[in-house]
From Swiss-Prot:
Signal peptide: none annotated. The gene is rgs9bp. Residues 1-37, 168-187 are annotated as: Disordered. This is Regulator of G-protein signaling 9-binding protein. Residues 70-92 form a coiled coil. Belongs to the RGS7BP/RGS9BP family. GO terms for biological process: negative regulation of signal transduction.
Amino acid sequence: MAAPEVSSAGPNMLHPNSRTLTLRGKRGHAAEDSSQGAVSDCKKMHSSLNKVTACYRQLVLCVGGTSDCTRLREELEESRKKAFDLSTDLSNTLMVLLMNEGVSQEDRVELERIWVLFLSTLEFFQQDLCKAHHLCQLFPLHGRRKRLVNTGVIGKTSEVAYRARNIKSPSSSRMHENQQRTERPCSPDLAGQIEHMERMLHDMQMKVSIPIWTVEATEEAWAEVASTCDLDECSDNEILAGEDITSRGCCAHGQSLPGPLCMVS
């Protein structure tokens, strides 16, 4: 007669190899989540940089015009410093991620796309810096020898500067580490920042070589035009309404003038 089987009441123990595989799987998922979070932060930071540089470009158009003043020069300085901080943080973060071999292929493709767009943004921003430097030399506020040009730009520039100040900068632990590691203050001199921007573009292209023609677009053309703006929408609507009323002439103000005079005005 066969002996009865005795079941062990002890707990089920995992094999050491299976435990190692479990730990590796958890670490892999954690690294993947961290990489995806860094890519998302880079997207947000590049979007913020685009908005700040766009506001800076609008402010540069007013230099030397009838709306030029000390306040405009201060707003240019504030927008320039904010764009400098965003571009420096994004450049350091992208270089660290692109030189990391542990980044997945999907995230690397997205990082390369952000990298190419970022280079284009920096080139446009550098052109605006050169334009602002040239106009500020032509039309100095103190000891002015030349009269301001009637460029047709009227109204205040505070709305544009307000939008630039309210643009939020995405922050993460990785970006703070890179900022502390390579912290460089913004040059108070406009010519100094132009030189710094040239060095930044040169270093980026030398350290990370990404052929532009290998990067494919993932969005439709002019998709940003149809997108909704989440910054100061009420202020933008008021500005557009004010421009619409101004463009209508005397008829919008309830003045009853003859037809020919109204057309001339």
